[in-house]
């Protein structure tokens, strides 16, 4: 039998990225924070639901803050320093997620609202009667 050459386990080298983008999608039910490089390749992400919040607590500003802290801490392995923030959606976690990214230690260079606004497209959901 032929001897198979053993492969030595290679350590995966993380690419170093100085500038990145943070995409915050704040819906009424959840907040999703994705940190990408300049080309849009995801480096890390976190959600309010994945951070341990369930039900109505998912849609709180504190849950968005925890999600942003988790995504920011995971992206620090790539050497990120500056973030450009894109916020989408009307949810309660918009501002607290930005503040949390700032508190993690990133320098926020730009904040852009990219909430999609229809040009009289689909009919919106009916108003809630509580």
From Swiss-Prot:
A biological process term (GO) from this entry: translation
One GO cellular component term noted in the UniProt record for this chain: ribonucleoprotein complex
Annotated Gene3D superfamilies: Ribosomal protein S11 (3.30.420.80)
Keyword list, A-Z: Ribonucleoprotein, Ribosomal protein, RNA-binding, rRNA-binding
Sample GO molecular function, one term: structural constituent of ribosome
Pfam families: Ribosomal_S11
HAMAP family assigned to the protein according to its UniProt record, in alphabetical order: Ribosomal_uS11 (MF_01310)
Similarity comment text for this entry: Belongs to the universal ribosomal protein uS11 family.
Assembly behavior: Part of the 30S ribosomal subunit. Interacts with proteins S7 and S18. Binds to IF-3.
Function: Located on the platform of the 30S subunit, it bridges several disparate RNA helices of the 16S rRNA. Forms part of the Shine-Dalgarno cleft in the 70S ribosome.
Protein name: Small ribosomal subunit protein uS11
